[in-house]
Curated annotation (Swiss-Prot):
GO terms classed as biological process: succinate metabolic process
InterPro entries named in the record: SDH (IPR005631), SDH_sf (IPR036714), SdhE_FAD_assembly_factor (IPR050531)
Protein's UniProt keywords contain Transmembrane helix: no
Stored Pfam families: Sdh5
Organism ancestry: Bacteria, Pseudomonadati, Pseudomonadota, Gammaproteobacteria, Enterobacterales
UniProt KW Nucleotide-binding keyword: no
Function: An FAD assembly protein, which accelerates covalent attachment of the cofactor into other proteins. Plays an essential role in the assembly of succinate dehydrogenase (SDH, respiratory complex II), an enzyme complex that is a component of both the tricarboxylic acid cycle and the electron transport chain, and which couples the oxidation of succinate to fumarate with the reduction of ubiquinone (coenzyme Q) to ubiquinol. Required for flavinylation (covalent attachment of FAD) of the flavoprotein subunit SdhA of SDH and other flavinylated proteins as well.
Originating species: Shigella flexneri
One Gene Ontology cellular component: cytoplasm
Subunit structure: Monomer.
Subcellular location: Cytoplasm
Family, per entry: Belongs to the SdhE FAD assembly factor family.
Protein name: FAD assembly factor SdhE
């Protein structure tokens, strides 16, 4: 997926679990543009993971084996915590 195709990335952010939508969509909407190109590529790789894995990682019930994905999960958690709750 092209890092500049925001419509497609936005669609990929929509998940089958509400809990994931609450974590991933605000991060994409508020933070994606400020990421480096490398971070954008890692975020897209994260979106290619299965929902159960994403849920476990974002809810701190495990962590990805891939160090880059782990850093992205922590970045999402940190930025969402700093921003506070947002309506989606």
């Amino acid at each position: 997926m092209d890092i500049n195709n925001k419509a497609r990335i936005h669609w990929a952010c929509r998940r089958g679990m509400r809990e994931l939508d609450i974590s991933i969509m605000p991060f994409f909407e508020h933070e994606y543009d400020s990421l480096s190109d490398d971070e954008k590529r890692i975020f897209i790789r994260l979106l290619e993971c299965d929902d159960p894995d994403l849920f476990n990682w974002l809810m701190n019930h495990g962590k990805p084996a891939d160090a880059e994905l782990e850093i992205m999960v922590r970045l999402i958690q940190t930025r969402n915590r700093e921003r506070g709750p947002v309506a989606i």
